[in-house]
Amino acid sequence: MRHNKILSAAIALCMVAFFTIGSVPSASASPPTPVPVTITAVYDFSTLPNVTGTFTTTGALTISGVSTMHVDLNPFNGIRAHCVVTLFPSTGGTIIIDQQCQFASSPPKGRWEIVSGTGAYANLNGNGSLTMPPFTEAMTGVIYLH
């Protein structure tokens, strides 16, 4: 009889624990907040495929500095390119941006995405669209704030 009382008490405690744990709200991270940004870079294209220039940003980031870009044209048709842009803010750190571009439209256009960074920009994420008027990379999109 005593064994049944202990077993009943143990089952009751397990049930209380189960329902108590089940009612605790789960902790979930809030999704990152997209904040608009514009990145404008101006280059000297006379040294293709590796060009150098300057950049400025507005919106979610307000920085400026030196920029480099490696242009890798599609060897089959020359209409598409993959570019890697590196921004060197005057305050330190780097931001690396991958671009996928096409030259069939006027002005040429494409997409960009921040793929890495260092210093204050180590965990920076962002993406958007771009147009390429002469000598310029005009990127608009969002930076995701965590």
Q: What is each model feature region?
A:
Residues 1-11:
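Bacterial N-terminal signal peptides that target proteins for export
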Residues 3, 25, 99-102:
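Residue-identity detector for glutamine
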Residues 4, 24, 124-127:
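Surface-exposed loop/turn and secondary-structure junction residues enriched for glycine/proline
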Residues 10, 25-28:
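Serine/proline-rich low-complexity intrinsically disordered segments, especially terminal tails, linkers
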Residues 10-18:
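Gram-negative bacterial Sec-dependent N-terminal signal peptides
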Residues 17-26:
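C-terminal segment of classical bacterial N-terminal signal peptides
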Residues 30-146:
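Beta-strand-enriched cores of mature, soluble protein domains
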